[in-house]
Amino acid sequence: MKKFLSLVLALVMTMSLVTVSAGAKDFTDDSEITYKEAVDVISALGVVDGYSDGDFRPDDVLTRGAAAKIICNLILGPTTASALSAGTAPFKDVPVTNTFAGYITYCSQQGIISGYADGTFRPTGTLSGNAFMKMLLGALGYDSSIEGYTGANWSIAVAKQAINAGLNNSLKGSFNGVKAVTREEACLYAFNTLKATMVEYDNRIVVGEGSSAVAISGVRKDLTWNKGTLNDGKIKKDGYVQFGEQYFEKLVRTDDTDDFGRPASKWTYDKKDIGTYVNYDLLVSEYTTKVKGGDVYSDIGSVAADYDLTYYVDGVKLEKDAVKTQSSYIAKKNDDKMGDSGNGVLTQIFVDNDDEALTIVEINTYLAKTDDYNEKKETLKFNEIYGYGDVKLTKKLVKAVEAVELDDIASIKDYKDGDMVLLTIANGEVKTITPAETVKGTEIDEFSKQDYVNAGQKYSYAATGKLDGS
């Protein structure tokens, strides 16, 4: 006879594992922001602001006038840029009283932006990805005439150059230069501009004079710092001038790791922390099922397979012998399972070619039962965390889970005794809590140690399944 059960479904999932950014601005719609690192850094610099009601509105489209303001804020800094004004109307639809008149005038004079053939600028019009990238490339020093950003095929040249410069790094999906840019995409592209290397031209030939002068040829090269400069390394220590190093001397990026051991960037501005963020530019692949050594080899290639390996499980760095074993599995067509990878485990693989470093991180999702929230202490404890401490690679290294404090995770006050939740844990500290999907009074159609079928839906276990009772 089929038995009716109350089931807690610990579904295989990739939880939102973003390091808390204590120094970043808090927007009321933070949960809707996809490019959190970019928005945090760009807003901390004052390049893009939120609205008076506390919203950021990441999906609102960027206007042409607002884009000009962003460029001026990047090049001049927000304080200097805010003082810009227009003595005369730069375009027939941009009077001197227009909010963006000063920004538009400056960008037009610098050759960064242009209007339409009918003499208009259309400041309230939307801006395509290609058009915004063209402006950013201009800020980096790329010459429109030399690089072919003019004529019928200008957008192709811009898209190619922007991608080569890394201005679309971390974009979800492929870059669509025809689509209107959203506010958070603008932040992402501007953020990538901060990290991009500036350029200059040798043997530049210019024809014409004044506003009609046009460069027709020149040899482009990356801009380098003079030997001994103190600015090199504030974004990347490579001898080249990154945009942020040139225009935001108080902005500093340093290599770091997040709580789970993933390669990360720590950002500070004027010696104040903005936040620490996973460096997804180094992420090669990720899995939520079993990973074979041969899979890793295929993902990273033969060169990176010889890099020094660092291996973390739930924020715990594996000891030398364990790492040596895991490293031996990374070979062509090898079927040995990497670590404790499997259902319910997020395995991420990072490759840093500059430092010749390979990092593999496993993050388990645990099912837990909560105790009552302690209002006096503002803490939440757990009656049981299923499977925690049983992970073979870290069994001897695992720490007891500490109570979660309200200051760290605000949602804990909503839980009561016996609630089932999903946790991620790093070095004994709970980092994320998410309510588990619970199905009550339902019927199990089929059951095995690997999976079960409930109401026609098949669920795979993260651990070996057990059925209690007859």
Task: Describe the function of each predicted region.
Residues 67-68, 129-136, 186, 343-345, ...:
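Amphipathic, non-transmembrane alpha-helical segments in extracytoplasmic/periplasmic proteins
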Residues 205, 210-470:
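Short, flexible, surface-exposed loop segments at domain boundaries
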Residues 39-48:
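Mature N-terminal segment immediately following signal peptide/propeptide cleavage
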Residues 179, 185-187:
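Predominantly the structural core of cysteine protease catalytic domains
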Residues 2-36, 49-100, 110-130, 137-180, ...:
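Feature responds to low-complexity, polar/acidic, surface-exposed segments characteristic
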Residues 189-192:
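Extracytoplasmic, non-cytosolic globular domains
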